[in-house]
Regions:
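N-terminal secretory signal peptides that target proteins for export/translocation
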Residues: 1-17
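Non-catalytic accessory segments of hydrolases
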Residues: 2, 38-202, 479-499, 509-516, ...
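Bacterial N-terminal signal peptides
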Residues: 23-34
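Alpha/beta-hydrolase active-site loop
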Residues: 116, 198-220, 283-292
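Substrate-access "cap/lid" subdomains that shape
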Residues: 217, 243-246, 251, 260-261, ...
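Alpha/beta-hydrolase fold nucleophile elbow
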Residues: 223-234
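Glycine-rich nucleophile elbow surrounding the catalytic serine of serine-hydrolase chemistry
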Residues: 233-243
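Mobile gating loops/cap/lid regions near enzyme active sites that modulate substrate access
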Residues: 421-557
């Protein structure tokens, strides 16, 4: 037999074998689908969706349908610790009973697990009562906008579990919440791991992008439009929103962005001073030790990746400072966020961005009052200002925010902290973004946001006002704030309704305005106007600079 004939025979045999294997695989998949369908039929009229990993069977509440604890990536454990997220395979039996939240990611307090890359999908109620197949088709017809929530917690704490998006979902949007790697398991640069040749350092940001990729591939099966995704987040989640705006790898993944309290001084300083992965590995930053020092502190003097991957997660957590920040790694983040915004080299989509009027009062309460050490005297105030701002800045801060001008020292420290850490840095970001994209700016300003001062049993010496994270309970009802009741008054409910309308209308159109709420115009540096979110109804104001000492003091730094 000639060589060419032998080759043809081999090719034909391979083709036959491939067809047999493909046929067997198809039969197997068909069998799994049949079993999954039977399982779904046996689940009464519970909502279902068919994803790339198999069938998910959710549950229905008064607020809509929910699909909880869906794995969006392989568990990042063992050899996958400190690697980019990998695709999850198939659900066992091709079916997932998606009725419970997945584990939070490992964090202080013994909370969570490394097997934590789960997401949750919340959809509006489906009107059809003709069985799961009709409901599934009904979802496909809708093409609803998708809101992708990134939780806060300093990149150290937090999870998707506390956020009930019922109010948002009732406005005909789909909400996705998820977990991403935190602490040194999510943000860690070390030379041996870098030497493995994969993208490294910003694992938490990689998880966020991987979850966005899952949404793009699967959300249509829940009734969502993969081309109408808005990312939104608060605090470190808002910071992550800015990081994704600046990331070339996130291009095309979303068409709108909302950052709540996401721009703060340490974050800006970190990015404007360009802490690269290489620097993080060898020298670290003012607030975070180098990767080499961290490895040594957890017992890996050999500096090997195998040693580090064998370190218990709890040991890594114990070594963490608070908060953490991402790195400029040359791929996911190719430049500082400040440079990206200033140059216009970012993902150019409409933005909502804002802060709360009394952001820093929360941190004063946590650091002083709630640990039994309130700032009561002028001397105690001077010491607290030096601790916050250092010896160089303390004298001008004390002159601009004198103890005698405030009812008590906690409020005075809260004022300088709010202006210097949150409000003025945020306005600088607003000004940069607004030169390139429509940027809708706000200040949440409900001075009576729950919980009330009286709820703390006399520990608080000042009202919290519109503190950091206070706005969350107006978007996510029932969220746990200090473990205390957070019932909204009738006027606060009106403000909540307006905020939910703005946020969801923005997700639908890229513009927060609708006929039922006060007009919200894009930010212009010439007018410096912003939307003041006050009860019962938002109002346009232009006194941000005078309220927060920005151009007179903080902008000079």
């Amino acid at each position: 037999m000639k060589n060419s004939e032998k080759a043809n025979k081999r090719l034909d045999h391979c083709g036959f074998t491939s067809r047999v294997l493909f046929g067997a695989a198809a039969i197997g998949v068909f069998t799994l689908i049949s079993l999954a369908t039977a399982s779904a039929d046996n689940s009464s009229h519970r909502p279902i969706a068919f994803t790339e990993s198999g069938l998910v069977i959710g549950s229905t509440t008064d607020g809509g349908n929910q699909f909880l604890g869906i794995p969006y990536a392989a568990p990042p454990v063992g050899a996958l610790r400190w690697t980019a997220p990998k695709r999850y395979g198939f659900f066992p039996g091709f079916v997932l009973q998606a009725t419970q939240f997945g584990s939070a990611c490992t964090q202080p307090g013994g909370i969570g697990s490394e097997n934590c890359l789960f997401l949750n999908v919340f959809t509006p109620p489906v009107k059809s009562d003709d069985g799961w197949r009709d409901r599934d088709r009904d979802r496909d017809r809708h093409g609803l906008p998708v809101m992708f929530w990134i939780h806060g917690g300093g990149l150290i704490n937090g999870s998707s579990t506390p956020y009930n998006p019922e109010l948002l979902v009732k406005k005909d949007v789909i909400v996705v919440t998820f977990n991403y790697r935190l602490g040194f398991l999510g943000f860690f640069a070390q030379s041996a791991i870098d030497g493995e040749g994969h993208l490294n350092g910003n694992y938490g940001l990689m998880d966020q992008q991987f979850a966005l990729g899952w949404v793009r591939r699967n959300i249509a099966r829940f009734g969502g439009d993969p081309d109408r995704v808005t990312i939104f987040g608060e605090s470190a989640g808002g910071q992550s929103v800015y990081a994704q705006l600046a990331s070339p790898l996130a291009s095309g993944m979303f068409r709108g962005a909302i950052s709540e309290s996401g721009s703060y001084a340490e974050f800006q300083d970190y990015f404007f001073n360009v802490v690269t992965v290489a620097q993080a590995e060898t020298t670290g930053s003012p607030s975070v030790p180098s990767g080499a020092a961290i490895a040594e502190s957890v017992g890996c003097t050999s500096q090997t990746a195998s040693c580090l991957r064998a370190v218990p997660a709890s040991t890594m957590v114990a070594a963490e400072p608070f908060p953490l920040y991402p790195f400029v790694d040359g791929t996911l983040l190719t430049q500082t966020i400040g440079a990206a915004f200033a140059s216009g080299e970012f993902n150019q989509v409409p933005v909502i961005a804002g802060t709360n009027h009394d952001e820093y009062r929360l941190f004063v309460a946590l650091d002083y009052d709630l640990v039994g050490n309130p700032i009561l005297t002028s001397a105690e105030y001077d010491t607290a200002v030096q601790a916050l701002w250092g010896t160089t800045l303390a004298p001008p801060v004390l002159a601009l925010y004198p103890f005698a001008a405030y009812p008590i020292g906690g409020e005075a420290l809260g004022a300088s902290g709010t202006d210097g850490v949150f409000s003025c840095p945020a306005r600088n970001v607003d000004q940069a973004l607004s030169k390139v994209v429509p940027t809708y700016t706000y200040e949440f300003n409900d001075e009576n946001a729950p919980p009330a001062q009286s709820a703390f049993g006399g520990l608080l010496t000042f009202p919290l006002g519109a503190y950091h994270s206070a706005e969350l309970q107006y978007l996510f009802p029932g969220i746990d704030v200090f473990g205390l009741p957070t019932t909204l008054s009738s006027q606060q409910i009106q403000l909540s309704d307006a905020m939910v309308s703005y946020w969801t209308q923005f997700a639908k159109t890229g513009d927060p305005n609708s006929s039922g709420e006060p007009l919200w115009s894009p930010y212009s540096e010439s007018t410096d106007e912003f939307q003041s979110l006050i009860p019962p109804a938002p109002a346009v104001e232009s006194n941000f600079d005078s309220s927060h000492q920005c151009s007179t003091f903080w902008d000079t730094f």
